[in-house]
A protein has these predicted regions:
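Acidic active-site catalytic centers that drive phospho-/nucleotidyl reactions
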Residues: 35-37, 90, 98, 113, ...
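Extracellular ectodomain surface segments
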Residues: 3-54, 116-157, 217-258
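Proline-centered linker/hinge motifs at extracellular inter-domain junctions
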Residues: 1-4, 8, 66, 112-117, ...
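Acidic, turn/loop-rich segments in luminal/extracellular domains of secretory-pathway
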Residues: 52-109, 128, 154-210, 229, ...
Length: 309
């Protein structure tokens, strides 16, 4: 009986070890043989043709001197289905000149094939009124058991995305977020959240947050008094706060009332000039009063009344 030694194992890695032209995975080695019987210290040769030794996933060529080469088609479903850390083995028997057999064992190691993710990747919500949007992702992955997601909640900058293992997702807007409340009508913000399939392939879901008009809060001096003939002017200052960015102000404007004119500045200071020639003013007797109510508006259109006696 001959003694067979040498390299009788090989290792391949899905995709990584593949020839870029042929997409074949290959491994090589050399067996040694010692046989005391004259003329039998060699192997039965097989080439990569009809006489190649066929394994379960590939084929093996061996020469008389023990040099062998193993080749497998990298595109096979069984190989492409391997994930990182998974493996297949292909055991092929070679034969020496006297009929003694020996196993050559080739291990095919898997690698992570990136998933392909599609479906609904965008959504829209609106401050105050529409706080939720939803969609569904699709995922395909040639690696067995990896065509799915995990149930998870992912915090974005403006809300939270809830993802199920089947790919359906729901986004809840945090309506109390200062950035959200600062959005005015016609302005938008985006919240981009990255999700991952089971194998770690990333995919982005982008949510558009539409702003709405938050009414300003107006305070300060909203009344004044003038007197026919003697005191024809009065003034005051309004205050304004508005969570919508850039809207906490007024506009420089002159507003005609029924008995005079109000002059308003952008910072809220106002002056009222009585039209002393107005017949209604001149018709007032001592102890009699009239009122002139004038409506002003902040930058976002919030109305406020100033009443002059």
């Amino acid at each position: 009986t001959p003694v067979i030694s040498g390299v009788d194992t090989g290792a391949l890695k899905e995709d990584v070890s593949a020839n870029p032209q042929s997409n074949e995975l290959t491994a090589t080695g050399k067996l040694d043989i010692v046989d005391i019987d004259t003329g039998e210290g060699s192997f039965v040769s097989h080439g990569f043709n009809k006489t190649a030794l066929q394994g379960h996933y590939g084929k093996l060529e061996i020469s008389q001197d023990g040099s062998w080469s193993y080749s497998a088609d990298n595109s096979q479903t069984a190989i492409q289905s391997l994930g990182e850390g998974e493996q297949l083995t292909d055991t092929i028997k070679v034969t020496s000149k006297d009929g003694t057999t020996h196993d050559v064992v080739v291990t095919i190691n898997g690698t992570n094939d990136k998933a392909v993710i599609g479906g609904s990747s965008t959504g829209a919500v609106t401050e105050e009124s529409q706080l939720q949007t939803s969609g569904s992702l699709t995922v395909t992955d040639v690696d067995a058991g990896q065509a799915h997601f995990s149930n998870t909640d992912i915090a974005g900058t403006l809300g939270t995305l809830h993802l199920t293992n089947s790919g359906t997702w729901t986004y809840d807007l945090d309506n109390t977020n200062p950035t959200v409340q600062a959005l005015g009508k016609g302005t938008t913000a985006t919240d981009t959240i990255t999700v991952h399939s089971a194998d770690g392939t990333p995919h982005q879901i982008t949510i558009t947050v539409n702003g709405t008009n938050d009414k300003a809060i107006i305070g300060g001096t909203n009344s004044g008094a003038v007197t026919e003939e003697s005191q024809l002017q009065t003034s005051g200052t309004l205050t304004v706060t508005d969570v919508d960015t850039g809207e906490a102000h007024f506009s420089n404007t002159d507003i005609a009332g029924t008995l005079g004119t109000l002059h308003l500045t952008d910072n809220g200071t106002w002056t009222y000039d009585l039209d002393n020639t107005n017949p209604q003013v001149q018709a007032l007797g001592k102890g009699a009063t009239a009122t002139d109510t004038i409506t002003v508006n902040s930058a976002d259109g919030t109305p406020h009344q100033i009443t002059i006696t």
